[in-house]
Regions:
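The feature primarily captures lumenal catalytic ectodomains
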Residues: 1-145
Length: 145
């Protein structure tokens, strides 16, 4: 029974992941893979679609991730292994970036009226660059549900 539930989690996580590339086929192995981690309850990226379109227009490969479906740790690690830059709202999803390679970057969008430095310490100690974008405008803040 437990294996069956684990298999469902693996496939739900993989099936919810979408890869976006430019239509003209100019994306290649030398281009950065940018992961956009979206949450759907609290702290989600309000303009995720615009963000993805802008990145694809610049010829980046975008991996659109949704871990709210209940990803297992091995699946999460597999999905993040080729991500060069992870963009996510501040929260537990940022912690998943520990599965990214050293010398990669994490961009945390903090729209909660406060900031916590905990993730900064973990990622910089692991050899990743960590940037915190603190949104102070009500235009980009999402209320708790």
């Amino acid at each position: 029974m437990q294996k069956k539930q684990a298999d469902k989690r693996v496939f739900a996580c993989i099936n919810s992941t979408k890869i976006y590339t430019s239509d003209n086929g100019e994306n290649d192995a030398n281009n950065l893979v940018i992961g956009v981690l979206q949450r759907y309850r609290n702290r989600y990226i309000l303009n995720a679609e615009e963000l993805i379109n802008a990145l694809v227009k610049q010829k980046y490969t975008v991996k659109f991730l949704n871990f709210d479906v209940g990803c297992s740790l091995p699946t999460t690690a597999k999905l993040l292994e080729d991500v060069d830059v992870l963009i996510s709202s501040h929260g537990n999803g940022i912690g998943d970036a520990i599965f990214m390679a050293p010398k990669t970057s994490v961009l945390s969008i903090d729209s909660r009226f406060y900031t916590e430095p905990w993730f900064t310490y973990v990622h910089t100690a692991s050899g990743r660059r960590f940037y915190n974008f603190e949104c102070v405008s009500s235009d980009c803040q999402v209320a708790d549900i």
